[in-house]
C-alpha cells in the first residue's frame, strides 16, 4: 500500500492580513493535491487543521471541496481527523469538515481497508483538549485493543505530544500504544523518527504559518510524506518527503552600506517578492524604502545605533504567550496549568467558570 500523510494546510489563513499570503496558502495546498493526483496513492491520511477557522471563507471551502472531489473521482480514499482549528466550540455547531463528507471519511473510530488482499487497520480521533486527557487515553486503549489482531496498523491524531512540543501538549509520548505508523498533525515542523517499533511522523504544515517556521522550512522543507507500506515492516527509508516551494522570507540586519548591499542581493535572488524581517538602522531606512516594490511586506524593525547589534531575543510573532503565562504564574505561586487552561478557555469562548469549579473541587474537596 502507498499512502500520503498530510496535515495543517490552514486554508483561509491571512498572514499579516495580506491577500497574497492567503493566496500562498491556497496555492501550496493546490500544489500538494496536484502532486498527490500524479502519484495516485491508495490512501490519503489528513491529520487535521485543513481549515484555519471554524468558519472559513467561502473560497477556502470551495478550494477544499474541489480538491477532495478530484481525489474521490480518482478513487483515492481519504481519511481525515478534525484539528483544533476546525473543532466546534459549542453544542449544535458543526465542523466545516462536514461539508466534505461525500468525498472523505471523517474519522472518529476505526476502519479496516483491504489493499491488494492485505488488511490495514486505520484508527483516529479528533483533537482533544488537555482537560479531556482521560477521555483521550480511554480511546487510545480501545484502539490498541481493536488493532491487536492486525499486523499493519495506523493511528491518526491531531495533538501536541511531549517532548515534541515541550509545553503546550495534551499527551505524553508514553501514552501512545504500539502502532506501525503514527500519522500526526498539529506541530508545523516535520518530525520523523522510529518510535515504539513503528514510525512516528508529523508531516508539518504545507506553508509557513508563522515566521519562526522559516528556518525549519529551509532545513526540512514543506509538503507531505509519501509512505510505501508494501513491506511487512516500516522503516524511515520507506518514507519520502514530497516538497513544495513556499514564499521566501529574508532576514536583514542593515547597519552599514555593506550589510545594505547584502540585503539587496538576498532580496533580488528571491523568485517572488519576499517577506522581510530583522533590523534596520534608522539612517538606512530611506535606503531600504527604495526596495519597497521588490518585497511583499517589510516586518523589519527600525532601531537606533545602540540596539542594532542586540540579539533578537524576542520574536513578537512567535512569542509563546502560554509559556510566559505559565512561567509568571509559577513564580507567583499560582498553578501554571490552571492559568494556561483558563487562558485557552477564554480564547475559545469556553466555560471558564466550570473549569474553576472543577479545579476547586478536585484540589480542595478531593
Curated annotation (Swiss-Prot):
Its EC number is 3.1.-.-. Its cofactor is Mn(2+). InterPro entries: Calcineurin-like_PHP_ApaH, DNA_Repair-Maintenance_Comp, Metallo-depent_PP-like, Mre11_archaea-type, Mre11_C_arc, Mre11_N. One of its GO terms (biological process) is DNA repair. Keywords: DNA damage, DNA repair, Endonuclease, Exonuclease, Hydrolase, Manganese, Metal-binding, Nuclease. Binds 2 manganese ions per subunit. The keyword Cell cycle does not apply. The active site is at residue 85. Nuclease activity is regulated by Rad50. It is an enzyme of class 3 (hydrolase). Mn(2+) 2 binds at residues 49, 84, 158, 186. Disulfide bonds: none annotated. One of its GO terms (molecular function) is endonuclease activity. The keyword GTP-binding does not apply. Mn(2+) 1 binds at residues 8, 10, 49, 188. SUPFAM superfamilies: Metallo-dependent phosphatases. Part of the Rad50/Mre11 complex, which is involved in the early steps of DNA double-strand break (DSB) repair. The complex may facilitate opening of the processed DNA ends to aid in the recruitment of HerA and NurA. Mre11 binds to DSB ends and has both double-stranded 3'-5' exonuclease activity and single-stranded endonuclease activity. Belongs to the MRE11/RAD32 family. Homodimer. Forms a heterotetramer composed of two Mre11 subunits and two Rad50 subunits. This is DNA double-strand break repair protein Mre11.
